[in-house]
Structures are given as structure tokens and as C-alpha cells.
A protein has these predicted regions:
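Short solvent-exposed coil/turn linkers within tandem alpha-helical repeat scaffolds
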Residues: 6, 18-28, 57-63, 91-102
Length: 115
């Protein structure tokens, strides 16, 4: 994680890819952090892949809405408007108490308009 904080994204990807944990929250965060590194490198296809893995590895009220949101934002960048819409809608209905649900209707409307 220190490499990510120091903007050394290649090393962040390298070391986080080797990270293994039985803790599902830590696994989700490490996978999502790889997505963050790829996103910072403007490698959006890879970022999308890792954000999707991160929210699928463990459905929970903490990490799932974070990585659903990040996945949806990158999906918009990639022109995957239906995927973005689905993820934003899932946040609205399944994670309505999350921070990511705040103003989610704006994002849903944007994705819907672009579909």
C-alpha cells in the first residue's frame, strides 16, 4: 500500500498482486487497490477488471459499494454504460446507507442517458 501512496503504481501492482490473505475484507481492499493503481496509470480496462473482482470477492456493506462505484465510474470512461448503470443502481437499492449512495441518482441518470 505504501507504493500506492507514493504514486509508485507499478510496484504497487507488483506487490499487491502477490498479497494473499484469508481475510475477505483485506483481500477485497488489496484487489481494489490494484484497480486504483491501474486507474492512475490510465489503464482503465485493467482497473475495471480489478474493481469488479474487488466487489465480487466479498459482498459486504463496507467494500462492496466502494468498488461498485469505482467500477461504474471506470465503466463510464470505457463506454460500458449498461454496466455503469447496473452498478450505480445496485448501490442505490442494496447499499442505500453507504456513502457512495449519496447523490447516486445523478450518476444513475448520467449512465441511463448514455446507454
Amino acid at each position: 500500500m505504501i507504493y500506492l501512496k507514493k504514486n509508485d503504481y507499478q510496484n504497487a501492482i507488483k506487490y499487491l498482486s502477490n498479497f494473499k490473505s484469508n481475510d475477505i475484507m483485506l483481500s477485497s481492499i488489496s484487489i481494489g487497490s490494484i484497480g486504483d493503481a491501474f486507474s492512475e496509470l490510465n489503464q482503465y480496462e485493467e482497473a475495471y477488471e480489478f474493481y469488479t473482482k474487488a466487489h465480487e470477492v466479498s459482498e459486504n456493506n463496507y467494500t462492496t459499494p466502494i468498488y461498485l462505484f469505482k467500477s461504474a465510474i471506470v465503466a463510464l470512461e470505457l463506454g460500458k454504460f449498461s454496466s455503469a448503470y447496473d452498478n450505480f443502481t445496485k448501490i442505490k437499492y442494496e447499499y442505500s446507507e453507504s456513502l457512495q449512495a449519496k447523490n447516486i441518482d445523478v450518476y444513475i441518470s448520467k449512465a441511463e442517458a448514455l446507454k
